[in-house]
Amino acid sequence: LTIVLILGASAVVAQEAAPARAQEVRVHVTSGGRAVTDLKMADFTVLEDGRALSVGALTSVQGGRVVFREGEGALPVSLDRSYTLLFQIMDWDPVLSEAVDHLFAAVLQPGDAVSLVTPFQAYHLQRDALAGRSKAELQKSMTDVLRKDILRGSGEYRGLVNELKRLTKSIGGSTTTFDEDLGTDPSMESSGGFGLEMQIDRYRQALMAMEGIRLVDEAKLLAFAGSLRPVPGQKTVIMFYQREYRPEISPATMNRLMSLYQDNPDILGNLMDLFQFYKREKTFDAGRVKKAFADAGIDFHFIFVEKKTQRVFGATMREQSEDTYPGFVEIAQATGGTAASSLNPSAAFKHAAAVSSDYYILSFRPGQVPGDGAFRTYDVRVARPGCKAVFPVGFYAR
């Protein structure tokens, strides 16, 4: 996954080197889909591991500004803002440029930091960039980079998908027109099923290569969270993840081949091996990652970009995102962020940016949390009817 390009530090090292945890929790409150910005300290109840906390102060932040503060125990509030946009996108969509337009036109302010991570590499916009260059210039530059890198970085992936389509159709025709399929590839021979073995082997290699490209590395996700933990202020991370489809040999074709070659143990063994690749195993522990993201104070928003499936004769187009989608949704929910599936990623981005801009910081009286390194959970409740509060699930006590 491309987010590995941002920083390579160990999450454990980052946590040990970070300053002591500020005793506070960031809370977003909505009602009917709109932010609620007029709550007071008395409207909130905060529990830690089921034990009520004494809230010492409340700070309301709207659009990067402190609107009001209440209570005498308020900790210093950093108004620094950093935005990280992650793109796991294989097909360029001009709608993505609308999201970048909105970022510069309606979200970013002087002093904000931006990181853009494409399928090819990461780019960082320093906090003073908006003061030295126009928003229009920066927006065009970022859009050009995004489009170029998506087209460039996804070339290998698209090539593998096309290879899988070709091989799937060819293997699917093995029971009837196999000799015709082999006629286009001089490296294969049809006698004794040798050509079929070669095609299955190539198909398996293409599957392995595709898995390597899309691998979500848990250690890198933890390191990413650890790298952001010492960063002060609001930390908004928005991931665009495009729905993926993979060409697979249809069950009917698989059964027909296994029946036809039941006396050929080599081909039967190769076909059985494919079932192992079709099994979708989780590639990262969402529970561990969501704790690291929550502890780092990250607002993580997950935008699942829908994509229409294609029909391929002789193949089954299998959804390939089911092993990662639930995990990222879980991380978003655990950090007080949002998760959305949409054919319009620009609209989903606007919603995520709006949600992240207005929040309350509830400060706790000092000395209530023993620094034993255990993960402690939060529960924040709002007394006003109809209000929904979202917040990080907890923190590592230090």
Q: How would you describe each model-predicted region?
A:
Residues 1-10:
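Bacterial N-terminal signal peptides
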Residues 14-398:
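Scaffold/interface architecture of coatomer-like assemblies
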